[in-house]
């Protein structure tokens, strides 16, 4: 059970919450702050003060005063009218993440909701009732209004949820779990939907997958180095310390650890003086992608614990301030950066695939074919990888450079952070598939070189891979092989924990 405080949630905890289904509880001190802040909101309503989002309309309607008797209706109308999401739903892990992050930000005690609302969010998490939230429709400011409105709907007993492996009406799940839908009161609708939790939840899942995929890329690249009898000197510690990037040094160190007892690597001048960049520069390129990941992790952990509501309530109600913490620009930039960093792992992987299949670049059978000419072998697998790499280049276009005005120009600059976050996740899926092609080719090359000559780590990795796909002895439908390896990487070597090279033993 992980305790939410509003201040301390980490990526490592999110891994346990999203991927292992661990439960959550609220810190009592944080809940006390929630209750105290709620008293301020109720006094504002009782006194008839004019405060945005509590006793006024929203967006362009911020100048419209709402009567006391209409405050509850205002919140309900807000949720229904803003539930304009479009398209396929977010993965269930993402909607679970939205619930967790929304509760966590409310526990900072500046949003003005009742403890009841926080408790309801936690009930949904712990009972694994996950909102069906369409992926499209958010501008990323004022936060993720449309996606979070779909999240808020289910608290009211409206909309749909994922529950026990099915997609059902929210009331079906609530009834089975013995829960009563809530009725929103002053400010609570706005507090539920004004934030960046859709882009951030998707970003967290993307980061977790990207981290594991990056470790996998090093293991697969190591197998390729063996298949091409690469020069191990290029990974010497002195070379990488001379440049000074710790991530580059760490990648080189892991590659050396993976290949320390390999009989397939060569020394400088033994077969050739130096290797092509796609082998020789693995630490420099992969290390740079790790720099991106470290940046993204830092920004995500800030946002996971951020108050992104509007208005925010401070000093016991002395200050009720309309600000712009809902603007998703920091996450938009981080997700665009993640897109570039991950796309580059696919770029260099595809070039290693080319070196494995091109007979002009190695002494292996052309396209790793068992009967070159009669059988095409891995020829079109390289095509498929090249296609994914090119698709990534389109997806990597920064969403954050775009903005379009909304709400009659009141909201005249937006982040497009949710688009960036969604595209980052798509890129990561493509990267995993490109790496799957590289792994298939590298395993085949290893067989020609002699499996007995592989390092202890890569040999174990090879045998596990061969449980997913057989050796290429005849042409077959290789699409199945690619998907089998992709699924295996994602579900077994995948996003549940950091890949330790020793885990392959």
Swiss-Prot record:
Renumbered to this chain, where is the cross-link 5-imidazolinone (Ala-Gly)?
141-143
Q: Which GO terms describe its molecular function?
A: histidine ammonia-lyase activity
What pathway annotation does it carry? Amino-acid degradation; L-histidine degradation into L-glutamate; N-formimidoyl-L-glutamate from L-histidine: step 1/3
Localization: Cytoplasm
| Sequence positions bearing 2,3-didehydroalanine (Ser) | 142
Question: What UniProt keywords are attached to this protein's entry?
Answer: Cytoplasm, Histidine metabolism, Lyase
Q: Do you know which InterPro entries this protein is assigned to?
A: Aromatic_Lyase (IPR001106), Fumarase/histidase_N (IPR024083), HutH (IPR005921), L-Aspartase-like (IPR008948), Phe/His_NH3-lyase_AS (IPR022313)
Q: What is its EC number?
A: 4.3.1.3
Which terms does the UniProt entry file under GO BP?
L-histidine catabolic process to glutamate and formamide; L-histidine catabolic process to glutamate and formate
Modification after translation is described as:
Contains an active site 4-methylidene-imidazol-5-one (MIO), which is formed autocatalytically by cyclization and dehydration of residues Ala-Ser-Gly.
- Report which reactions are catalysed by this protein: L-histidine = trans-urocanate + NH4(+)
The EC class name is: lyase
The UniProt entry's GO CC annotations, sorted and at most eight, read: cytoplasm
NCBIfam families found in the cross-reference section: hutH (TIGR01225), PRK09367.1 (NF006871)
Protein family per UniProt: Belongs to the PAL/histidase family.
Looking up HAMAP family in the UniProt record yields: His_ammonia_lyase
**Annotated protein name in UniProt:** Histidine ammonia-lyase
Q: Quick one: which gene encodes this?
A: hutH
């Amino acid at each position: 059970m992980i305790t939410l405080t509003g201040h301390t949630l980490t990526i490592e905890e999110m891994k346990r919450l999203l991927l292992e289904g661990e439960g959550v509880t609220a810190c009592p001190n944080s809940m006390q702050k929630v209750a105290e802040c709620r008293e301020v909101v109720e006094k504002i309503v009782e006194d008839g003060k004019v405060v945005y989002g509590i006793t006024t309309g929203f967006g362009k309607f911020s100048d419209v005063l709402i009567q006391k008797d209409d405050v509850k209706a205002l919140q309900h109308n807000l949720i229904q009218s803003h539930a304009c999401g479009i398209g396929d739903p977010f993965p269930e892990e993402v909607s679970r993440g939205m619930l967790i992050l929304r509760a966590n930000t409310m526990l900072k005690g500046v949003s003005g909701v009742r403890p009841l609302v926080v408790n309801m969010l936690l009930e949904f998490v712990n009972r694994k009732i996950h909102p069906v939230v369409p992926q499209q429709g958010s501008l990323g400011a004022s936060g993720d209004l449309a996606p979070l409105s779909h999240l808020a709907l289910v608290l009211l007993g409206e909309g749909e949820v994922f529950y026990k492996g099915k997609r059902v009406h929210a009331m079906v799940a609530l009834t089975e779990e013995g829960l009563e839908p809530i009725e929103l009161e002053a400010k609570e609708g706005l507090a539920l939907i004004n934030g960046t939790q859709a882009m951030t939840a998707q970003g967290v899942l993307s980061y977790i997958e990207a981290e594991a995929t990056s470790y996998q890329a090093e293991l697969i690249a190591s197998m390729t180095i063996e298949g091409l009898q690469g020069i191990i000197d290029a990974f010497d510690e002195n070379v990488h310390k001379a440049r000074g990037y710790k991530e580059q040094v760490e990648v080189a160190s892991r590659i050396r650890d993976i290949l320390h007892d390999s009989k397939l690597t060569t020394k400088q001048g033994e077969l050739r003086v130096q290797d092509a960049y796609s082998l020789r520069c693995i630490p420099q390129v992969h290390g740079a992608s790790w720099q991106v990941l470290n940046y993204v992790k830092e920004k995500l952990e800030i946002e996971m614990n951020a108050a992104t509501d509007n208005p925010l309530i401070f000093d016991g109600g002395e200050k009720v301030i309309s600000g712009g913490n809902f603007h998703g620009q920091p996450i938009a930039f981080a997700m665009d950066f993640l897109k570039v960093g991950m796309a580059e792992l696919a770029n260099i992987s595809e070039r290693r695939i080319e070196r494995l299949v091109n007979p002009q670049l190695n002494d292996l059978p052309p396209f790793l074919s068992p009967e070159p000419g009669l059988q095409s072998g891995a020829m079109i697998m390289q095509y498929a990888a090249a296609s994914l790499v090119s698709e990534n280049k389109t997806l990597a276009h920064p969403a954050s450079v775009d903005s379009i005005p909304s709400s009659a120009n009141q909201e005249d600059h937006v982040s497009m952070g949710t688009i960036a976050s969604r595209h980052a996740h798509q890129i990561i899926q493509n990267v995993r598939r490109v790496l799957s092609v590289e792994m298939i080719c590298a395993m085949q090359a290893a067989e020609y070189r002699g499996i007995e000559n592989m390092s202890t780590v890569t040999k174990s990795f090879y045998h596990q891979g061969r449980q997913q796909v057989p050796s290429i002895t005849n042409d077959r439908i290789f699409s199945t092989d690619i998907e089998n390896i992709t699924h295996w990487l994602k579900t077994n070597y995948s996003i549940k924990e950091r890949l330790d090279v020793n885990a392959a033993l």
